[in-house]
Amino acid sequence: MRGYFIVLEGIDGSGKTTQAKLLAEWFEDKGYEVLLTKEPTDSELGKLIRRIILEESVIDGSKISYEAEALLFAADRAEHVKKIILPALSEGKVVICDRYFYSSLAYQWARGLDLNWLIQVNSFAPRPDLAILLDLPVKESLRRIKLRGTLTEFDKIVELQRKVRHNYLKLAEMFPEMRIVNALSSIEDIHSDIVALVKHELLGL
């Protein structure tokens, strides 16, 4: 029996990682085998992408182009899909992924890349059974990022986050598997909303 593939998406600070863990625990309590994963992955390629994002100068001393960045994300995703996601699904596991190709579309579209090109680059990636968009106002996102102590270049981040949030909401209109959850609620209420979605959309409960 094929498993379920669930993705959590949202702008920085929206609580994706926390909610992915809580959802994994919920499924495990119900007796399901669960694979909790993320993108970029922990592979060598995924680590390289994180270095590029953080340092922006690891290739030749200058920032790589957004096109090259998009292709690196897609390469990491291709490995992730073939070696981790599809095998787990074929074993009947529930795969919960913290970020997926929607992140590439939302962020790299915000940086000026062509959306249709980005969709084509990621066309190999199977669509999940359910993609949950944790929607959060940019002001609250920035407050949470500040609390983590990871906020730099404030003005640039504000503008990027605005564009990314707008893009995510557009993607929710384009992709029927995507559902929106209000990420301003408490952790517990958000989890309850996600569980309700899973029960309705996937489990028929």
UniProtKB/Swiss-Prot annotation:
Keyword rRNA-binding: no
Family named by the database record: Belongs to the thymidylate kinase family.
Pfam families the UniProt entry points to: Thymidylate_kin
Name assigned to this protein: Probable thymidylate kinase
Domain of life: Archaea
Keyword field contains Cell membrane: no
Alphabetically ordered keywords of this record: ATP-binding, Kinase, Nucleotide biosynthesis, Nucleotide-binding, Transferase
InterPro entries: P-loop_NTPase (IPR027417), Thymidylate_kin-like_dom (IPR039430), Thymidylate_kin_CS (IPR018095), Thymidylate_kinase (IPR018094)
GO terms (BP aspect): dTDP biosynthetic process; dTTP biosynthetic process; dUDP biosynthetic process
Gene Ontology molecular function: any one: ATP binding
NCBIfam families: DTMP_kinase
Reactions that this protein is recorded to catalyse: dTMP + ATP = dTDP + ADP
One GO location term (cellular component): cytoplasm
Positions annotated to bind ATP: 10-17
EC number(s) from the headed UniProt entry: 2.7.4.9
